[in-house]
Amino acid sequence: MALTSFLPAPTQLSQDQLEAEERARSQRSLQTSLVSSRREPPPYGYRKGWIPRLLEDFGDGGAFPEIHVAQYPLDMGRKKKMSNALAIQVDPEGKIKYDAIARQGQSKDKVIYSKYTDLVPKEVMNADDPDLQRPDEEAIKEITEKTRVALEKSVSQKVAAAMPVRAADKLAPAQYIRYTPSQQGVAFNSGAKQRVIRMVEMQKEPMEPPRFKINKKIPRGPPSPPAPVMHSPSRKMTVKEQQEWKIPPCISNWKNAKGYTIPIDKRLAADGRGLQTVHINENFAKLAEALYIADRKAREAVEMRAQVERKMAQKEKEKHEEKLREMAQKARERRAGIKTHVEKEDGEARERDEIRHDRRKERQHDRNLSRAAPDKRSKLQRNENRDISEVIALGVPNPRTSNEVQYDQRLFNQSKGMDSGFAGGEDEIYNVYDQAWRGGKDMAQSIYRPSKNLDKDMYGDDLEARIKTNRFVPDKEFSGSDRKQRGREGPVQFEEDPFGLDKFLEEAKQHGGSKRPSDSSRPKEHEHEGKKRRKE
């Protein structure tokens, strides 16, 4: 038995088999054609209404002039349709050359690989073959020089052609040609047997436009060649492979605007939740426990703070009630006129409280100085020990600094002094300064009168009118008052209390709302504290 009997039948025929089958089909068609029909035009005189339309209607002749229609015998004169079909070409073996498709629009010298054998590397049979040897240095230099000259020539021609005005081309050297005429004789060629002709290139006009119009349409070159198919033929996919290749669409877990129906297994597979194990960190438990403990301690602290606040509020309330009871008891005793033995103690306690309050103010002042800015601190320390007269008497002239001790001259040469027994034994009378200090009119005017030079910018030109204006005049005066009394021009003046108003007010403050005045009198050392009041 032959080996071909075991092999399966081929699914495709080879090129030789296809050509043989085509030839056999053509021979069978020729054998089956029994009658060969040949069409001829009607004879002359019977061609009325006949119009030639096919090539067979013309026969072997040309057009019919008596028939006035467009005629194309042998398709002469007919416009051919444009077609991109290529003519079939065959190789020396008679096979169709399919590489003509890849060679369309390419030069004939271009190497195009269109066969499978072109991908297989050639086997080197002889390593010493001269065609396989690398060229030497001289050949490389020669080829390089030729390439450079050719490129320079091409580039120079294109650059010169693009320029509107160019220099004249360099003329070729003259050529000398020896000419021997065919007609020899005295009558011909001036009797000369030979002539030497000097051939010179004709000068070209640089501004001359081109004489010939080149409008040749060059066919467009083919695109990149198709990629060779290097994979096995496609085979039909099985149902299992089709199901495996079904990729679920990208559907969000929150939005599904198109309303796709996604199986739950596909959605979980796309989500990837089951691909990893969930591991809870132990720090979460520690954090929860710490938060619980902190919350419990905070609640306990709040509860204890609330209890302490309630206790303090209760004590404060009791203390306030006790104070109110004491004040009520003292008020009842004052209404009843009952003397208390603690009045003296209250006066001493009040003095101690005043001293304590003054010391507290001094300490507060020292703290403020320590916390103040450097510039402000220096200013406060400078004004701390100044005399009160320097602070308030801003208009006095600046006293000259001298090392001599100054005395009040009014204390000398007085009739009342240590030898006069202090005004007849009245040691409580304070009349040492019985006259005004520097009571001159000029000094009073300089202190209590604004300066024109300094205050003119503030008050303007009506300074005199403002000074003369009585700004502190009452609308309604007392009866019996002297309106013609001249106003004072000096400093503030004081007078003694002639009616004892200060004593009366002091007793009223001491007894408060008591109906019966107390028999106790003020101490003697406080008797003359309020004997002077301010006079305006």
From Swiss-Prot:
Q: Give a GO cellular-component term.
A: nucleoplasm
Q: Region Interaction with PPIL1: what ranges?
A: 59-79
Write out the ranges of the annotated region (SNW).
174-339
Q: Which UniProt keywords apply?
A: Acetylation, Isopeptide bond, mRNA processing, mRNA splicing, Nucleus, Phosphoprotein, Spliceosome, Transcription, Transcription regulation, Ubl conjugation
Q: Where in the cell is it found?
A: Nucleus
Task: Indicate the cross-link positions, Glycyl lysine isopeptide (Lys-Gly) (interchain with G-Cter in SUMO2).
Answer: 81, 97, 115, 122, 141, 158, 170, 193, 240, 258, 286, 339, 344, 416, 441, 452, 509
Record field: compositional bias (Basic and acidic residues):
467-489, 503-530
Biased region (Polar residues) positions are 27-36
Residues found modified as N-acetylalanine: A2
Q: Which residues carry this modification: Phosphoserine?
A: S14, S182, S190, S224, S232, S234, S446, S479, S481
Q: Which InterPro entries match?
A: SKI-int_prot_SKIP, SKI-int_prot_SKIP_SNW-dom
In alphabetical order, the GO MF annotations are:
nuclear receptor binding; nuclear retinoic acid receptor binding; nuclear vitamin D receptor binding; SMAD binding; transcription coactivator activity; transcription corepressor activity
Superkingdom, according to UniProt?
Answer: Eukaryota
Q: Which GO terms of type biological process are on file?
A: cellular response to retinoic acid; intrinsic apoptotic signaling pathway in response to DNA damage by p53 class mediator; mRNA splicing, via spliceosome; negative regulation of DNA-templated transcription; negative regulation of transcription by RNA polymerase II; positive regulation of mRNA splicing, via spliceosome; positive regulation of neurogenesis; positive regulation of transcription by RNA polymerase II
State if Nucleotide-binding is listed as a keyword. no
A Pfam match: SKIP_SNW
Region: Disordered; residue ranges are 1-44, 212-233, 311-386, 467-536
What is the recorded function of this protein according to its Swiss-Prot or TrEMBL entry? Involved in pre-mRNA splicing as component of the spliceosome. As a component of the minor spliceosome, involved in the splicing of U12-type introns in pre-mRNAs. Required in the specific splicing of CDKN1A pre-mRNA; the function probably involves the recruitment of U2AF2 to the mRNA. May recruit PPIL1 to the spliceosome. May be involved in cyclin-D1/CCND1 mRNA stability through the SNARP complex which associates with both the 3'end of the CCND1 gene and its mRNA. Involved in transcriptional regulation.
Assembly notes: Identified in the spliceosome C complex. Associates with U4/U6-U5 tri-small nuclear ribonucleoproteins (U4/U6-U5 tri-snRNPs). Component of the minor spliceosome, which splices U12-type introns. Interacts with SKI, SMAD2,SMAD3, RBPJ, RB1, PABPN1, MAGEA1, SIRT1, FOXN3, U2AF2, PPIL1, DAXX and ATP1B4. Interacts with VDR and RXRA; preferentially associates with VDR:RXRA heterodimers. Interacts with NCOR2. Interacts with MAML1. Interacts with NOTCH1 NICD; the interaction involves multimerized NOTCH1 NICD. Forms a complex with NOTCH1 NICD and MAML1; the association is dissociated by RBPJ.
Family the entry assigns: Belongs to the SNW family.
Q: Which PANTHER family match?
A: NUCLEAR PROTEIN SKIP-RELATED
What this protein is called in its record is: SNW domain-containing protein 1
Gene name on record? Answer: Snw1
